């Protein structure tokens, strides 16, 4: 049962909550927040909290800058790494204009609209995200270095794996915050880790991903480390992916359970994701560094699907019951989770609505170049991805024009900065490593 504003006010009063962080994302996925003294929370629920949208990248012009934050009480959680006395609560927010009309830059609202579209088709959507990250040492001033925490590899154990205790702290913390951790392990790269948490309804899954990323960053910092979700922080090592898993439920039945056939709703859904994969890339892989990851160290590059084959962009993992799903392996964690999940879902729903044809599965190892002959590839650069997305009828129908323009304008600035940097590595540290 969803929690109400009164439920949260009662909790605040009974549990010594002193501060409330109202959190949201800009259109590029960067988390922002304002902290309220707990006594201001009733006003926040009743009237919203005004803020200057012109100071948030991609939001508003200065001539009409006021926007209103509306906290979602069902997202309330206490930050477990803060003091037990004078506790700190966090809630995610939706954003409107002062007159109550929807704000086009409210990407959380966009995902809600796509979920509503799925519900109108009789579908419940569950989403699970697998998110990789690196742990780096910091210098004597607390600044991040490019020295990984350890030199362990995939599934290694201590002493090669030095991140085990920190992963345990992350799991315990996110569990307190309402996520359900399932397993964690050392990944392929030195200092690279993965913590997996259980799937959830689409909107909650996007909220959970933001919670996870902020928890990892905070817990790493408390341990004198720096956590990076940058797609390719070490150019000669594995990149950080964000594997997005989706399942569809109709009348209590998981549509991905059993054999996938081209004329099934699950088949049409996969066909829609494949049909729009190139158009989604500017959102799923939104920074120049994203393209150093694609096609290297087990990250996919070609638009294809298969059962279980990890070299494919889309695969159907071996599973049973409610765990049957489709997995999109191309995205990284640099993007806006509400746009990423919303657009992937919208692409799949478009496949169902238009009964798009499902290509034949590709049962080859696409990490061997000769095996990919004849297959369409994802864009090879952010500039190419912007061009594909900007010319897409699908994207034009899904996202407000103002949001598209600001999004692509910002990405074009990133391309220009990267391409003209005297030292691209220094530029990537400032605009990627230190912010993602």
Predicted regions and their residues:
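Glycine-rich, acidic/polar active-site loops that bind/position phosphate-bearing ligands
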Residues: 1-436
């Amino acid at each position: 049962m969803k929690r109400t504003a009164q439920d949260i006010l009662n909790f605040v009063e009974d549990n010594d909550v002193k501060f409330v962080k109202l959190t949201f994302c800009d259109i590029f996925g960067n988390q922002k927040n304002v902290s309220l003294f707990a006594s201001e929370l009733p006003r926040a629920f009743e009237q919203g909290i005004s803020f200057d949208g012109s100071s948030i990248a991609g939001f508003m012009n200065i001539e009409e800058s006021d926007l209103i934050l509306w906290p979602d009480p069902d997202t309330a959680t206490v930050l477990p790494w803060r003091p037990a006395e004078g506790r700190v609560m966090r809630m995610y927010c939706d954003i409107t204009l002062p007159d109550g009309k929807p704000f086009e830059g409210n990407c959380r609202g966009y995902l809600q609209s796509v979920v509503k579209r799925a519900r109108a088709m009789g579908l419940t959507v569950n989403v699970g995200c697998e998110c990789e990250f690196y742990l780096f040492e910091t210098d004597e001033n607390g600044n991040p270095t490019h020295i990984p925490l350890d030199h362990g590899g995939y599934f290694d154990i201590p002493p090669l794996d030095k991140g085990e205790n920190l992963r345990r702290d992350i799991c315990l913390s996110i569990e307190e915050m309402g996520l359900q951790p399932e397993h964690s392990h050392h990944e392929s790269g030195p200092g690279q880790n993965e913590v997996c948490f259980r799937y959830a309804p689409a909107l909650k899954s996007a909220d959970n991903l933001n919670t996870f990323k902020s928890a990892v960053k905070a817990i790493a910092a408390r341990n004198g480390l720096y956590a990076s979700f940058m797609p390719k922080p070490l150019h000669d090592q594995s990149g950080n992916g964000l594997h997005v898993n989706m399942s569809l439920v109709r009348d209590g039945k998981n549509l991905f359970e059993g054999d996938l056939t081209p004329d099934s709703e699950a088949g049409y859904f996969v066909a829609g994701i494949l049909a729009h994969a190139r158009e989604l890339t500017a959102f799923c892989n939104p920074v120049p560094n994203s393209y150093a990851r694609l096609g290297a160290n087990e990250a996919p590059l070609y638009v294809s699907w298969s059962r279980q084959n990890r070299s494919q962009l889309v695969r159907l993992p071996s599973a049973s019951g409610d765990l049957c799903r489709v997995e999109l392996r191309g995205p990284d964690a640099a993007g806006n989770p509400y746009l990423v999940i919303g657009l992937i879902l919208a692409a799949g729903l478009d496949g169902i609505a238009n009964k798009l044809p499902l290509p034949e599965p590709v049962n080859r190892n696409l990490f061997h170049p000769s095996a990919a002959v004849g297959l369409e590839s994802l864009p090879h650069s952010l500039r190419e991805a912007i061009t594909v997305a900007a010319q897409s009828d699908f994207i034009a129908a899904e996202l407000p024009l103002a949001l598209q323009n600001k999004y692509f304008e910002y990405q074009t600035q990133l391309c220009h900065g990267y391409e003209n940097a005297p030292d691209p590595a220094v530029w990537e540290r400032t605009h990627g490593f230190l912010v993602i």
